[in-house]
Amino acid sequence: MNKKFTDLAKKSKVIVIKVGSNILVNEKHTLRKKWLATLVDDVQKLQKKGSKVIIVSSGAIALGRDILSKKKLTNLHEKQAAASIGQIQLSQQWQKAFAKLKIQSSQILITAEDLNERRKYLNIRNTIFSLMDLNVVPIINENDTTSTEEIRFGDNDKLSAMITNALSAELLILLSDVDGLYTANPKKSTQAKLITDVTEINHDLEKYIDKDLSEFGSGGMQAKVNAAKLCIQSGSTMIISNGLVNNPLGNIHPKSSTWFLPSKNILTSRQQWIWNRPIQKAILHIDEGAAKALKKNSSLLAIGVKAIEGRFYRGDT
């Protein structure tokens, strides 16, 4: 492992690793078992250095589609059916890979609604902490079978960032089919240059984002940068690195990946939860004075509210 990455990993008590469908599943739509074994080997090395590791794994829909012999899933219900079939195989393969190294793993399926409700959010967080205390590696995925179109995470990049925030993890690693964020799509332009360090996500940076989605995934680079926004506000480092190689964690290098560095202005745990909630039930429009007050962590007074969209209920935040 590269020294800079090794030093960061040593300082990271909790590390979240997101594995996308496009690197977990090959062009024949089957699981890359040999590659998975090398990733699990990397995870064990991180554990031996003292880090707790959480995996956010896509792949259920892609695997289920192959089992159903469907070239294309045309609607949400077909995707949910594929997910319910593929999730069993996905979980089994993770369990087998970790078991070979005598590491216990577990499965957690989460919906956006689970993280939107404070009580459920805290319960999920406490469950994951308990699993980590038992040296169990949680394998997390969105519960695609029960999620609805209107209230889905949409991509596991966002889910992994929210898990990172919930656990106050120091590091999130997004394993992708590209090295990181480029000034242009490297698959389309020979002039594309890799951006290795990002200290601020602004308009100048976002203009480089290619809007294309992956074949199996639903996010693309835009989703990864959105995930980075969530991470850096909570004081976490996020790395986008090429996961197609064997031992993908061992091959992370600062010159061939993109590192999003933590913001100096870190939100509190509750502020992170409010800011990152996947479901917004209603919207408050406030005046300039109220906006300035909130930026200083002052209270919002009724006089500063100009309009309300939707409906708030008791307990909403």
Q: Where are the model-predicted features located?
A:
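C-terminal catalytic "cap/lid" subdomain
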Residues: 1-104, 108-317
